[in-house]
Amino acid sequence: MWLEKIDIQHFRNYSEASVSFSPHLNIFLGRNAQGKTNILEAIYFLALTRSHRTHLDKELIQFQQNSLKLNGIVHRHSGNLPLEINLSNKGRVTKVNYLKQAKLSDYIGHMTVVLFAPEDLQLVKGSPSLRRKFIDIDLGQIKPVYLSDLSNYNHVLKQRNAYLKSTDKVDINFLSVLDEQLADFGARVIKHRLEFIKQLEEEADGHHSILSNQIERLKISYESNIPIQNSKDIREAFLTTLNQNHKRDIFKKNTGVGPHRDDLKFYINDMNASFGSQGQQRSLILSLKMAEIALIKKVTEEFPILLLDDVMSELDNHRQLKLLESIDEEVQTFMTTTSLDHLSNLPPNLKTFLVKNGTIYEKQVD
């Protein structure tokens, strides 16, 4: 798939912009704080209805405006598909082929994206919430039912936590009813994640082996606070663990176990990657991004759109070359950079844009 054009109204520092893209490589050039990253963020937001930079919607809407609007035309094997998202203080309104979508899970997945940004380098050593977000974004794009199960799980979790906070005399019978519901949806969430991590590991290990000249093997472990022996017993194990934690949850007034607390661990040659070198960690992240592209292609039968936000400056020449070599010519790629000097072997069928003070100019490469 590829994004033919995007129309932007009141997004970040853009009042209005309309940009048509190459189906291959698109490079946004400009000094810092001119709006390069905002373009990639707009594409990301059009695909996923959320930003990768902030959880505060009001930061996305241009100063002194009340709403934003993004329109895009996506080319898929099945034909052209218009997408639209409106954001205001009333929430999100999404449309596919001009038809309003009842749920975000009905919208997400029509345009798939893989983002590689400098903050992704924190995926190995950062907080568990970053790794859960990584799973949610990738898995949500290729398996809409996951988003539905996750949404239902979070809804019951919110109910359970609210009840624990609301009283000092907890009704164990009522708490057990909530436990049953939480275990139902939570088991589904964990099962989806385990299947996804197994597929991701297979893809990422192959890429990491190539990057390390066949020296290193990559393993990914899903770390749950629920003792999981096999996928058939997840619900019962979750329910048992919730019951065992009743005293703790009542005392702390929150839910201490479940997929909302789970984590990922990465291992290079059986060593925890958080103790690895910076070079090893960068190769690991690069392997994950390559694996994301391959996995989305395998599941959806279409390549995702690749967003590279100022990451070339974070990679040495070897990793730059491996990244560029790994990008199939069918993968539409968007890249931001302050200069083309450090980039070599760029394909001829690219478009280059100059970004200055929230205005985008198409330019010819010398």
From Swiss-Prot:
Subcellular location as annotated: Cytoplasm
Pfam families membership: SMC_N
CDD domains from the UniProt entry: ABC_RecF
UniProt: ATP binding residues: 30-37
InterPro entries: DNA-binding_RecF, DNA-binding_RecF_CS, P-loop_NTPase, RecF/RecN/SMC_N, RecF_2
GO cellular component: cytoplasm
NCBIfam families according to UniProt: recf
Stated name of the protein: DNA replication and repair protein RecF
UniProt source species: Streptococcus thermophilus (strain ATCC BAA-491 / LMD-9)
Classification of source organism: Bacteria, Bacillati, Bacillota, Bacilli, Lactobacillales
